[in-house]
């Protein structure tokens, strides 16, 4: 006897009084056709409400009214949230300005005029995500980093810009390296465009490329054998952050099928990683830089992860 037959047999012989009573569904032919069509529904073929019965149509329209009200409230919430964030961004600015002065020795704060050496480099390397992006070659250039700032591009949008302020150094001419993120909010937050600074490297100082020396054996006398050949290749560097992945413009693509083809999984992963790094800098590093410098933020983050694990364990129990 199969498991299914055993179950049926047990149900017949057992007391049905302790089984939950399931109300019968009054489904007519029209509703059956509706369920079949909904099952085969695709995003490219929206369901026609006119095919419903008058009673069900009335209910669906009422549900749509509820959804409209919800969307209006959500839009109001996001606007008020954006305004509140803008207000507090302005309150934070004087504090970040004082931090800049102390880190860079502009004011004494009962310390030496040299400020806090390698403040931002150490703070960044304490964060695991950022540390993974920084190579040993990068460190010499990042020692010239004076400040990292975040600002809104437009007060009522999710667009934001990160600015890295550098002292005069031996690596590049730019005093500021920036990265701007444009987010489309019309149909939910979608990363639309990312713009990074073109770094003006001094000759022989580019950290995003490396020169590879190869030996090419040439036929002939021994004196001309093993001629050294040089080749420039891309290499890992934090400064690749300012050269973001290129996002295809939707307007330039014929339809969403073509867009999905262009947006390969690899490109999507690169975009996600790039955005995660930017948000980490904006939401974690900049507001709590001194805690990352001292390592306290790392301890707090570990404690937060432990609490999340405990909460998950309780839910599973």
From Swiss-Prot:
Q: Which lineage?
A: Eukaryota, Viridiplantae, Streptophyta, Embryophyta, Tracheophyta
Regions crossing the membrane? none
Q: Family per UniProt?
A: Belongs to the nucleosome assembly protein (NAP) family.
What are the BP-aspect GO terms?
A: double-strand break repair via homologous recombination; nucleosome assembly
> Where in or outside the cell is it found?
Nucleus; Cytoplasm
Assembly description: Can form homomeric and heteromeric protein complexes with NAP1;1, NAP1;2 and NAP1;3. Binds histone H2A.
Residue ranges of the motif Nuclear export signal = 52-67
The task this protein performs is described as: May modulate chromatin structure by regulation of nucleosome assembly/disassembly.
* Coiled-coil stretches: none
From which source organism is this entry?
Arabidopsis thaliana
Q: Name one GO cellular component term.
A: nucleus
Q: What is known of its domains?
A: The acidic domain is probably involved in the interaction with histones.
Gene (UniProt): NAP1;4
Question: Which Pfam family, just one, is annotated for this protein?
Answer: NAP
Q: Per UniProt, which keywords does this protein have?
A: Chaperone, Cytoplasm, Nucleus
Q: Which residues form the signal peptide?
A: none
* SUPFAM superfamilies reported in the protein's UniProt record: NAP-like
Query: Could you tell me what this protein is called?
Result: Nucleosome assembly protein 1;4
**One GO MF term:** histone binding
Q: Position of motif Nuclear localization signal?
A: 214-219
* Highest taxon above the source species: Eukaryota
Q: Provide the tissue specificity.
A: Expressed in the root segment covering the apical end of the differentiation zone, the elongation zone of the root and the mature pollen within the anthers of open flowers.
